[in-house]
Amino acid sequence: MGSEGNMKKSVVTQVSIGGFGESTTAKQLTDYLEDEVGIVWRCRLKTSWTPPGSYPNFEIADTSNIPSIDEYKKVEPHAFVHFAVFESAGRAMDAAGQCNLILDGQPLKVSLGPKNPYSLNQRRRTTVPYKLAGITLEIGTLVSRDDFFVSWRAEGVDFLVDPFDNTCKFCFRKSTAFSFKDAVMHAVINCDYKLELLVRDIQTVRQYKTLHGFVLILQLASSPRVWYRTADDDIYDTVPGDLLDDDDPWIRTTDFTQVGAIGRCHSYRVLISPRYENKLRTALDYFRMRRVQEERVRWPPRIRNEPCFGEPVSDHFFCIHHKEGISFEIMFLVNSVLHRGVFNQFQLTERFFDLLRNQPKDVNIASLKHLCTYKRPVFDAYKRLKLVQEWIQKNPKLLGSHEQSEDISEIRRLVITPTRAYCLPPEVELSNRVLRRYKAVAERFLRVTFMDESMQTINSNVLSYFVAPIVKDLTSSSFSQKTYVFKRVKSILTDGFKLCGRKYSFLAFSANQLRDRSAWFFAEDGKTRVSDIKTWMGKFKDKNVAKCAARMGLCFSSTYATVDVMPHEVDTEVPDIERNGYVFSDGIGTITPDLADEVMEKLKLDVHYSPCAYQIRYAGFKGVVARWPSKSDGIRLALRDSMKKFFSKHTILEICSWTRFQPGFLNRQIITLLSVLGVPDEIFWDMQESMLYKLNRILDDTDVAFEVLTASCAEQGNTAAIMLSAGFKPKTEPHLRGMLSSVRIAQLWGLREKSRIFVTSGRWLMGCLDEAGILEHGQCFIQVSKPSIENCFSKHGSRFKETKTDLEVVKGYVAIAKNPCLHPGDVRILEAVDVPQLHHMYDCLIFPQKGDRPHTNEASGSDLDGDLYFVAWDQKLIPPNRKSYPAMHYDAAEEKSLGRAVNHQDIIDFFARNLANEQLGTICNAHVVHADRSEYGAMDEECLLLAELAATAVDFPKTGKIVSMPFHLKPKLYPDFMGKEDYQTYKSNKILGRLYRRVKEVYDEDAEASSEESTDPSAIPYDAVLEIPGFEDLIPEAWGHKCLYDGQLIGLLGQYKVQKEEEIVTGHIWSMPKYTSKKQGELKERLKHSYNSLKKEFRKVFEETIPDHENLSEEEKNILYEKKASAWYHVTYHPEWVKKSLELQDPDESSHAAMLSFAWIAADYLARIKIRSREMGSIDSAKPVDSLAKFLAQRL
């Protein structure tokens, strides 16, 4: 889709025209314009629109017999005109401006159409869609391989397969009733409808021939997008061929079929006339080129109308709500299996539900969770459920469960799209204050996320639309109108919904959830109501809705509960440091060393020294507390007024995050800014080349692999690093090879998708304040830790507690930035200095409290309440003049006060308004495009304007101030490096384009090869060295734990559609399908957290108390732990147990890979055993990779 060659200038070939009389035809207008202005290719004249304040009413199927009105506000006649050459559009605009365009005595108004790159116009004209007109479309369900149930049918549909934008469209016309608020009558208007899907959303295509023509059956991964616009246009074309669409908006809507066919059915049967045979063949060739899977049809399926064909459904979501004798937990999982497409609704008979009624709850939960991991449809639900239940009963080890930490909760999720909803299997997540308090009813909480079809981010264009610019000019109507999708969302928020026998009501949301378009709902019971929960949370006195909502959301921040700190131990009156209207201490307080150590103990952190700062929630306070020497006055926590957000009596200190080693990576925004500030392109190129060289050597050179793991993977690389250092080799140890391969491909993915280049002399650091007041303006203090895997063995007894505290004080110029950073002034150049009084602070960025303006505020308008900053002290990344560009002014938007207390409906309205107006992602993407296309880069005027808009958008959750994206700044073309496959792209010649193309081919080849690579389970090597005498006694217990662990891990792989376990265990995830979400980062973080919780849970199981442990010496304990680790290894790697493990993965499938990560939960003890078996002569003490072996060998 990229246009190679030079970028052609953007041109306007379209205009919108109004002011002519109602009797004017498209041909008359065309003839006049060709005489006065220039050749016209197409003229589309409109006299209809969606009446303001109305919505399509799809409950009315037959519009011929309803009372209709014609007295709604009509639109002035207007036309959309495409000229042959762009000069004609300019001439028309000029002539109208001078009142020289007069038709039938009436002066015409002209509005310029969209500005499009010349190459885009040309490509649209030369890329011909494969149009199969007059087809019959049947939307239904492939109930079995031989039966197709039709839910909805339409004739005279046009089917377009369009390589221009890689879409398929079903287009047809339909009379539609529009309803008005508080009105009985309806307006009846003809509308054009469009069902649009991306070619990549077609899972399979089947094709066969009948006596009447050809048939395609398209199996979709998700529902198509539904659009409409008013029809009966008078169209006059003077040339054949396709043109770019004009300004007349297509409006998103919901499922218009009364039977809910678009939402619940993903099989589309297309009946095509024999005269389109050649076009059909070409379209199928295009599908093959796009790698759509083609399935052979041995014989055509039987076609029948579904039971209850044509009967309206009132269900918002297409769920099976309640069955007598079946609990909510089971019904939710049944719907999860149904929504995943494993079973279809016609298979869920009473026989199926009787199977569930006749088995214990734990068997049913395990069975349905297992079925949720299936990737393909199953056509006999009863038979498969029975098979899985029997298999689980034969293997009771799959049923056990471990008590979860109080910081972990099992969360149910519901995803709501414009046409349907999806129940997602419960996920283990970090808990929050509310869930911990209401633990007894925790399963009545539901996380609801609003998304577009294909699990894409729902954006403002789905929820609202503007009329065409010419209509604005003619009617002075510049308002945006809400779509029917918005009405659906708003009714769900306001009225709640029923699900599996429960009624759910809106509760609240955190700041992260607001960005994620999600919120908490709660199903009230007789004892606990939504109002009770909100009363317990605290007193929220803000009269600004945005601020009040944000503060309620603090109770839903994901946190660890640690120490109960009594009010008399907390100073809440510490004054803020204020100057020139700025708060230099905004969001930061202090914590005493003894309390900081207590918190670390509660968190059970695997670190050798206490974090020096924590991001916290305490009562109604939020922010960061930095470790600072105690004043011996009994005060353990000092909190400033800027940290106080609401009143609460809650006294548990809750932790969101803490300072730790976090490797530094560049990204596209930072590269764009550093480049415009004068850092040469060759610097970024050389840094990427160095990274590529190491990644290409990672599987063959243990020294390089060890360096990559310890320097760029943080704690997620520890297991693989320990294995390398102990002497395990990637060539003979498949799990180690898999982990290294995942790190390599995921980092290549980061380079391709985000230009995520590793910076050796760089970190991501939490911002803190110089409480001592020593640093001057323009200075900072940075002390960073270096990774040391020896510290992973500190629990192995006193001989191993000698920790390496390897700290480095950074000196010299540093560049800092915080995401998002769009303005050149967002990169601050500071001088890092050594201050002995601050040596107790490490892995954080200490800012001065002196100066006219806080450096935090200069950097993207940030503060000190937990923001992370990219910091680089590699002098090659410092701009040549060693100075900061003038910072943008980040003045807080004026707050709107209601003049009264904020109520529940205000919060709902605010959430809905955010959904309809969220623009930050759009603005940031537009900034990338304009910076790439302009010779001035990020200093281009349009980029500076976008930076201002982004700053306002970032603050929307706090201020409620809406930002709108100017139409002229919306990109029409995207640079190739943005990977916008579904849009028009061009080849970028700037540094980001060069970096992208350098790595793209490497990544594509490696990802494909890695997808196909698998270890033959029968060829997994077994290392007998790891057998410790007496391990046999622990095998039964080890096997039970492995069954449970593997079951949960396989569930995560299936739920997130990730291919390999090594991706999850290293946190380097690369195989998640693109259609899952545009915001893959958020999904990956959730997956990482789910796995970390799982790993922590089983590490706790591993370390569970040994009998008579109090009477055992450290060495005796270690020997017992080594036996346990040996048993865990044996049930994972021994051929006999590998075979058993594969049998447990699925009762009747044999295509799975052996799961190996369970053994390495005890990697530290397996490393001890391995190192003892090595000859000391083979350990090179000078090599970093052998440092651990030497360290342990001296102590074992």
UniProtKB/Swiss-Prot annotation:
InterPro entries, A to Z: RBD_domain_sf, RNA-dep_RNA_pol_euk-typ
Chaperone among keywords: no
GO molecular function: DNA-directed DNA polymerase activity; RNA binding; RNA-directed RNA polymerase activity
UniProt effect for mutating G866E: In rdr6-13; alters post-transcriptional gene silencing
Impact reported for D826N: Alters post-transcriptional gene silencing
First-tier enzyme category under EC: transferase
EC number: 2.7.7.48
SUPFAM superfamilies: RNA-binding domain, RBD
Highest taxon listed in the record's lineage: Eukaryota
Knockout or disruption consequences: First leaves are elongated and curl downward. Presence of stigmatic tissue in the middle of the septum at the apical end of the carpels. Altered post-transcriptional gene silencing (PTGS). Accumulation of ARF4 mRNA (targeted by TAS3-derived siRNAs). Upon infection, over-accumulation of CMV RNA and enhanced susceptibility to cucumber mosaic virus (CMV). Reduced levels of TMV-cg-derived small RNAs.
Pfam families (UniProt xref): RBD_RDR6, RDR6_2nd, RdRP
Subcellular location: Cytoplasmic granule; Nucleus
Reported effect, G825E: Alters post-transcriptional gene silencing
GO biological process per UniProt: defense response to virus; gynoecium development; leaf development; maintenance of shoot apical meristem identity; recognition of pollen; regulatory ncRNA-mediated gene silencing; regulatory ncRNA-mediated post-transcriptional gene silencing; RNAi-mediated antiviral immune response
Gene Ontology CC terms: cytoplasmic ribonucleoprotein granule; nucleus
Catalytic activity: RNA(n) + a ribonucleoside 5'-triphosphate = RNA(n+1) + diphosphate
Tissue specificity: Widely expressed.
Keyword Nucleus among record annotations: yes
Subunit structure: Interacts with SGS3.
Protein's job: RNA-dependent RNA polymerase involved in post-transcriptional gene silencing (PTGS). Possesses ssRNA and ssDNA-dependent polymerase activity, but does not have priming activity. Possesses in vitro 3' nucleotidyltransferase activity in the presence of UTP as single nucleotide. Required for the production of 21 nucleotide trans-acting small interfering RNAs (ta-siRNAs) derived from TAS1, TAS2 and TAS3 endogenous transcripts. Acts in the RDR6/SGS3/DCL4/AGO7 ta-siRNA pathway involved in leaf developmental timing.
Family statement drawn from the similarity comment of this UniProt entry: Belongs to the RdRP family.
Protein name: RNA-dependent RNA polymerase 6
Source organism (scientific name): Arabidopsis thaliana (Mouse-ear cress)
Lineage: Eukaryota, Viridiplantae, Streptophyta, Embryophyta, Tracheophyta
